[in-house]
């Protein structure tokens, strides 16, 4: 039996694994390293600053800057990095700091009837663990507007479904949303020869400003301090005090989660986006049907009640993610129903050390944002999460059977990667 099984091998899962390995826990981590990051279009860039994009290890030895140095690249403030570079950084981090990683996906996490958990991989093998850390990223929580749900994938996709976008050249594509994913997707589609329109409920597009220099004098730094979430005192509170955020009333946390750090494009994207000529704001999709010639007819409604019709070849919904337990299908249905939730929302309530209301089940990443605040929507939150979560695991192990974990050997090398058996 493992002390800890980690489900997910993105920034949060890898960071938790690095801390758990350093503490000698007998652990196993399942997932394909940085899979969703590797699947992004190569023309996309990291929105966050390099110094706010580190994965977490106990010694701080394997930050993004350390990886950049091995590549002869300077990770500089105010200079965006390609998402492919960040994905490769995650791979490197795993080789340096994480013990043997099992690349199979997990299909089920369920109580084992003996106080622990049964974790089942995609090939049917089941392993047992005293504790589990669920770090499944954002993909299970994709949000698509109601009228578009259930339509064929040839007509409607989420922005996260796409790697390269060159297959849309010459086609009419409607992108729904007003955040970074929508604006960058629209810009890339335009660059690659698609006819693109943006359709958004927002009345205006918001753009982040060019970040001020890190060294700008005491007074300017005091007025608007830098944080991993952007400049300003409100962002500093979100970035530095997730533990205090967790103590707020549930309704307050839900409201802040829904409103803080709203949709906005990166400052460096604005010039690229200027090529997108058809931008329709203050409108929402109220209906959608497939036409006789296999296109999509969208009924749109304005804020003033006006209505209109858009015909398009394809819709890409860049409409974010909703951290609802009902979408965490990897958890057994009975286990999902057992977990306490934040207020009236569907997100799980998370304790002081990232433990859910079910002893031994720990959560990381987006699922914890309604408990710990906006930091958990970003890679930046992994630094706060990983060490505390592993502390919680160690406390739970001591409170349980009292059986200690085995000693993890040296961090794995690329040759130690565990893969699924051939079928």
Where are these predicted regions, by residue range?
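Flavin (primarily FAD) cofactor-binding/catalytic cores of flavoenzymes
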Residues: 1-33, 78-180, 184-423
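Flavin (FAD/FMN) cofactor-binding and adjacent substrate-gating region
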Residues: 39-72, 226-246
